């Protein structure tokens, strides 16, 4: 069997005497050549004096070894003593709180050695407690403060800023923030710094002044004043509009978004959005613009009052150039708009909105008007015009050349009235009328003397439905569009 008794040899260089102390334990002979462990040896000068004998003790060496491993003889032991004169070994199982390895109260012999030590990290050196040092030689390390853990998770792996992520597909730095368990997109930016600024503004709005941000809170004093009256959704929209990309179908302009069909549209109510589009279309495209709303008086655009459009229709029916035919003409002037207020009419030109006291006028065709011509005041008709044979009446503005009317007998016995006038401006969009319409001259004509009528400032053009005496064929001929000459 192996003898595992451990010998502790205490050698003094000045006294040449050895005191052996047998200690029960398990260790290795750290000074022996066969089983030397250099990693557990620490160079130090052990200067410990026991019982005040400073004059007699100088350097003391403590050595642990197994008896069975001794095999060299006296010469090897003396060589080991000389080499380990300034060596101190490290204890594998140190005694807690600086207690002696052997009970010092039970033994008063000077061979008793305190081999326990405490490793205090001070300047990178190891401090031994010693037998006389006590607690004074110990260096207490101050407790380290725990690192503050972020409440919002770790920083982004692809950026040094919080809430910023770089996407290789788009090549932009995108900013996101978590709110109520959902990730809110704040926009894509060209630089990580701009994305971090957007995240900070959103974090301050969402979580208050105690939010974890990338920069100091003092940089956002002006932004805090501007965001005071805004909601979270409005702040997010503002940040998205300031971004450099439209990857999420958002525009840098307020109220504009990319539609599914591929165009940019306004994010508002349908009626107000259509009115805004119509206003812009009328202003930039004029009569050729297409309307999105029904022409109704309650849906008029009051802001378009300053838009000057020529929506008057001109119908020119040639009756010849003879002086007799010109003398037989009847001049009709402007008819007040208030005489026809309240009529329910329809118009084919969608851009010509119709209402009284508005910048737009009704554009009425024969089939869209009332058959009762007596709806107009009788003062506006001559005695011959009040007869049942009256067919058509054309009302125009005073600034345009006078229109002439001439009637002729038909085989059916009725009377048809034809109007002649020089060509006017181009017709309105989608009106169905051409620039000029031709009519063959007739042999007989009825002369209607001109009557001065009241002139108003608002222009308008009305075509009253022909009388029942005119055949349907003649009525269709009057309203059928003709190509320009």
UniProtKB/Swiss-Prot annotation:
Residues 160-216 bind DNA. Its main location: nucleus. Residues 124-161 are annotated as: Disordered. Induction: Repressed by miR172a-2/EAT. This is AP2-like ethylene-responsive transcription factor TOE2. GO terms for cellular component: nucleus. GO terms for biological process: ethylene-activated signaling pathway. Probably acts as a transcriptional activator. Binds to the GCC-box pathogenesis-related promoter element. May be involved in the regulation of gene expression by stress factors and by components of stress signal transduction pathways. Regulates negatively the transition to flowering time and confers flowering time delay. SUPFAM superfamilies: DNA-binding domain. Belongs to the AP2/ERF transcription factor family. AP2 subfamily. Pfam families: AP2. Residues 124-135 have a biased composition (Gly residues). It comes from Arabidopsis thaliana. The keyword Thylakoid does not apply. InterPro entries: AP2/ERF_dom, AP2/ERF_dom_sf, DNA-bd_dom_sf. The keyword Nucleus applies. The lineage of its organism: Eukaryota, Viridiplantae, Streptophyta, Embryophyta, Tracheophyta. SMART domains: AP2. GO terms for molecular function: DNA binding; DNA-binding transcription factor activity; identical protein binding. It is found in: Nucleus. Keywords: Activator, DNA-binding, Ethylene signaling pathway, Nucleus, Transcription, Transcription regulation.
